[in-house]
Amino acid sequence: MPSDRTHIIWDNSNIFISGRSVCDKLERKSAAFRINFESLVDLAANNRTIEQVFCVGSVPPPTDAVWGHIEKKTGKKPELYERGAESGKEQAVDQALQTRMLRLGYDFDPPETLVLLSGDGSGADQGVGFFSDIKRLHKFGWNIEVMSWKDHCNRAMRTWAEQNGLFVPLDDFYGSVTFLQGLRNAKPLDLSKRPAKV
């Protein structure tokens, strides 16, 4: 039986770029679109103990208050992997994150809960990528939760998460996990609306 500790694997570029597209449809102000990192972390944790956070993408600087928020909640500094501007699809950084994710299956016994903040299901037909790796961790007994924007999550990964773990659509929390710089503040996060695994 997995414990209540939560490990957050976060592909911020995927969440940000997809979220900006959602913003363009809802508010047509994508240039001002920002992620409210603290609310996103709180949504992922859902009042559970955060064991660790691994984040890749265009992330705030290590001194940013969001990382202090995570450190305060966990007692640990999150691991941040900045994507290089010239790395094309930046697959090497994704692979580094996936390696960290797979190590969880060996390093934690009993299994715990993994929250994947990404809708990237690429590579699954070759047995690689985030989708393949969450299935591997699930075989080890891990609880799996996928948080992504509905229309920007790989369809097969979303269906798998709904059937084998939990899918949390970020769209349902759009006003809380986003803000428009200089135009709209984030609303308070209401965790009572977050789906939970039964």
For each predicted feature, which ranges?
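Domain-level signal for Mg2+-assisted phosphodiester chemistry and nucleotide/NA-binding surfaces
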Residues: 1-99, 138-152
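Fold-independent oxyanion-binding glycine-rich loops
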Residues: 12, 119, 170
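Extracytoplasmic/secreted cell-surface and envelope-processing proteins
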Residues: 18, 124-128, 155-157
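Hydrophobic helix-cap positions at the C-terminus of alpha-helices
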Residues: 44, 104-108, 136-137
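Exposed acidic/Ser/Thr-rich ligand/metal-binding surfaces
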Residues: 101-130
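Acidic, low-complexity intrinsically disordered regions
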Residues: 124-133, 137-140, 170-171
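C-terminal helix of von Willebrand factor
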Residues: 150, 158-198
